[in-house]
A protein has these predicted regions:
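Sequence context surrounding c-type heme c attachment/ligation sites in exported
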Residues: 1-3, 65, 84-219
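N-terminal pre-domain segments of enzymes
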Residues: 1-51
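Conserved short histidine dyad/triad with adjacent acidic residue
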Residues: 52-57
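Short alpha-helix capping/helix-loop boundary micro-motifs
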Residues: 58-63
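Short, well-ordered loop/turn sites that connect or cap secondary structure elements
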Residues: 68-71
Length: 219
């Protein structure tokens, strides 16, 4: 089991997370998810995925992220579109970060995609990627994108000297997204319940605020 191994596999494909790596189409047991509000990362776009082992569930925490079982994987791919003005832009996959729940705790690593976007290779020491894209205003942008090393990955996720996930809190997931397998939108917590990942979703009054939504109140 690549997730529970003491070492990180050299190639991302060894985890078997994706049926179609280029299109970022996951396998049946890996589900996409989104966060209501997320960290800014040099204008990159992100795709997030979750794997929870069969017959295991995440436990609700009111003031923290879900408590995920051993063998859980949180997967996040960073990319730029070639041209944000296009109806169907071509994604330029940069890296995929994995956060794995092992017996020794959460472990983080980054994988950098090859030129053909067929697979991604483990980069313990990180890497700098020179890349460019065209934004929605038609401006060409370039950046020296920095892939973090393993220590930097763990520093960002450290709390009380323990590595933990940051984003998947109930209030940050409490909104609808489109699911291609059921061909409709559904609240993410409800979908997780239907997939057997959590017990019946606890009704929460608050949803995290989307910082990009200019209609929200400042109060």
């Amino acid at each position: 089991n690549a997730i529970m191994s003491d070492n990180f596999p050299k190639m991302l494909s060894e985890y078997n997370f994706f049926n179609d790596p280029i299109a970022q189409i996951p396998t049946n047991k890996v589900i996409p998810y989104q966060l209501m509000t997320e960290l800014f990362s040099d204008y990159t776009k992100k795709k997030r995925f979750l794997y929870v082992p069969n017959n295991k569930k995440a436990v609700f925490e009111e003031d923290s992220v879900y408590q995920f079982p051993l063998g859980t994987a949180l997967i996040k791919t960073f990319y730029y579109n070639d041209d944000d003005r296009k109806a169907n832009p071509v994604p330029n996959l940069l890296e995929t970060r994995v956060l794995l729940k092992r017996k020794s705790g959460w472990k983080a690593a980054s994988y950098v995609w090859d030129m053909e976007k067929k697979d991604a290779e483990l980069k313990i020491a990180g890497k700098t990627i020179h890349t460019s894209w065209v934004n929605s205003d038609g401006e060409e942008k370039s950046v020296r994108y920095r892939v973090p090393n393993v220590n930097q990955c763990q520093e960002c996720h450290e709390s009380n000297k323990r590595v933990i996930p940051i984003g998947p809190k109930a209030r940050n997931l409490n909104f609808n997204i489109y699911y291609s397998d059921i061909e409709k939108e559904l609240n993410q917590l409800q979908y997780w319940f239907q997939m057997g990942l959590i017990d019946y979703p606890i009704v929460i009054d608050k949803t995290a605020v989307d910082w990009t939504d200019h209609t929200q109140s400042l109060d």
